[in-house]
Amino acid sequence: MCIRDRQIDDVVVSFDVLREKFLCNLDACKGECCIEGDAGAPVEFEEIEKLEEVLPVIWDELSPEARAVIDAQGVVYTDEEGDLVTSIVNNKDCVFTCYDEKGCCYCAIEKAYREGKTDFYKPVSCHLYPIRIGDYGPYKAVNYHRWDVCKAAVLLGQKEDVPVYKFLKEPLIRKFGEDWYAELELAAEEMKKQGMI
């Protein structure tokens, strides 16, 4: 693998992914990232089939409103920017969101995965948040997305000294592979030695 600046193979990684701190704090935010925003979570075309396959497993967990949206338009739609995203209820909640007794939002797909009912964790864009993957010419761009609803996660990440890329090790490996992540860690260590991050 070739690393130049902050590039690993055909992936350009924002310095913010390496230097900013982040650690989800569900007790504080209650899973707000799954219910706020103007569109659903980005979905890769290959994930549509997985989302449809998991529906019978999670159907009873979903709200009646979410089931109605899925019946009417499916598990995904194309947003105003032309991207495939998860369907949403009332222009905010992802159709796969559920709530526990404390009012904390959780993903019905992830819950089913943790219970051993499916081998699909959830869309990779959800797993990667607050990282967003975009296109940058012939390259993939790995960017840190700042959002006010995640202030508590930033504070906890700073307190515990957890960089974004370390917090998201598992989903980064899921997306790009073990070797790629090992190169990312090496690049981060070298940049830290040089005082770049």
Regions found by a protein language model. Name each.
Residues 4-197:
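Short loop/turn segments that flank or connect secondary-structure elements
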